[in-house]
């Protein structure tokens, strides 16, 4: 019987019901580039990650022994009837970025491992003190080297027994004389050992014993070899050869510097690992930085006096009031050193500031204390604010207190290694005149050029050829996915989701696997339109190797390049989970049911505003120089919506998140943050609040949900507490909280589920038997509002709740904003852990529902992440609403539909990394479109037509 080949050509999914999928059946072509698209919340990720990937992983796990499975953590079987033709699956999503401070681009791509091997095998060690090259040679190599001197050269072999040490060294000289040696060289002068030698014991001396004198000629090899061995024994592996013409040749049996008496260990790959004690800087343990208390965070406003509360660090706030021990110490210091606690801190002389910050240097002061803890006189040697707080930080066992103290710390480069992470001996090893830190801190673009032009000796090339081939290939893959501006030393914790995903994509291309299903989640995030083609060609390369690519994506270019598009919908949440259309971009355009097709064909489009609003003022950032910013001045308009654009790595986040947001947060919100490098920001007085609407989760536990985050749950609980039934039972609003005892089910502590550990099977979460997953006890659930219990309300979607509460204006207003930002499908009580993609829009809705001051600045970083064309359409309307009434909206964005609707654009560039950091163009979208040097202008021009 012939095999059914159609099964092999497709991943055949039947009856998928994961999350909101409605018994979905679809045949996804194998070995092709397939894009899954649809509205946000339509079920794309449920199909790609929770069904296809989950089942692929589960089947692989099933093939392992139960012993191995207990360490790996099992995956639950997805709710699907069958999946046939499923290849092994690899997921490249955005959530699994490694936030470990020891993880870098180099370590996650394993390029750094190859560099460690290269440096260990062909690196040239140098003395970490004087910088001279250190060579390690065997006796035979030394003999060959000396025999290569011109014939008849007179040489003497010297044993350097003392290098730069004080003393008379009489014993050593006597010992040399007894051993039969005749001459000795001291501080460059030759002496006979038979004469009286008297050395000044207070001066550092160099002493070399003359072991042999020879003339270079054939036949002396045996004698030369014996003499060298004698020298090496006397001088602990060192040999000096004086050629009588004043030239000294140094030889070493180990890696040691004859001048500085510095020895270095055998060079191995681990010598270059900052995660290994053999290579890491001993001071910062390979982190490259230290967390240190910062006096600018401890005393942020130096125009205040101590009595007015200048010292804000934990443990010292009480020094403003009489009766605290901290106040008694400061009173004692003021008496001893004659200063007043009522003087503004900035007016103290440097000596007084130093005493307060760094202490009395062991000098005790008399502290008179009278307070709640009794009274007495104490002798206290004040260690200074910094050391005192350091001690408290070390001694506290409370995580909360540790976090509190850490808010007064800042990251400073390690003083020992200058932020280079390795010990000095490892940093003194070079390849092509660069140490490993210098090489890994080059941008990928520069590194690629450096590797191409690398000058190595014949022997180095012979040894390092294969290693260099691997390095060059992997560096090229990083370049191909548009990451030229990154360096291998960049910490992975500082990467955006899109960057981290593209790095993992480059690693997978490098692995060269075949027959795998790669499942990706919006790889184009954070990528400028200019770099999209490179990303697409990388994806094609992965497909052409013989792999299946399933990409969840909203980017138009990616859809048009795909072999097949699967459109899930038609709506979001309850209204999604079905197959709407499938085929090429052209097929979708012809399909009347596909909203995606309508946007691709241009039937639906986001309109360009008829007119651009004029700014009401400007914020002027002076001398911005954080990261790659080139000391630039930037004017940010107020009262309108501004888009900050530019290629990846151009400096957008440095300007907006590091400088503008942190400076405004410090000045307006009194946040304990240190802004990026800049001179000043003018015009801050025109604002009263800054809000950063980022993509971080709205909560880290399942107890946090949209209702609690937006604050609407408080009003819903008030409503339930106001019912006649609740009043009759004496229930207050706290009764309707699942976080406190009283109304919640105590069997599951209000979680609704109970976790059962299963060892080598996955942990099982079962609904609580007592409350049946409803989180509240029976009495609380008996209280109804319009025939619905508090559980029923939490289980409503935003759309259902909007109708249910239409006669309660305060509640309706908050729920309406969730609906307006496109979140009609989420449930009010849905755990925040299930809402990672929706977090930013929930925050947007929360801000929209607040009363506007007209002097607020909102900062958003790529709000279109995870949004379909139709969702972007809604977002544009929301951003316009936010900036009404005098508020300012600043958006970092690559999406051209958002950029074209902005009132103003500031384009940073022209390139990423070192070639970026300047303002390329600014003005309305129409003005920027005319700029001959702006990449953004070139692309936005097409969207304005």
Model-derived segments and their meaning:
Residues 1-945:
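Conserved phosphate-binding elements of NTP-dependent enzyme cores
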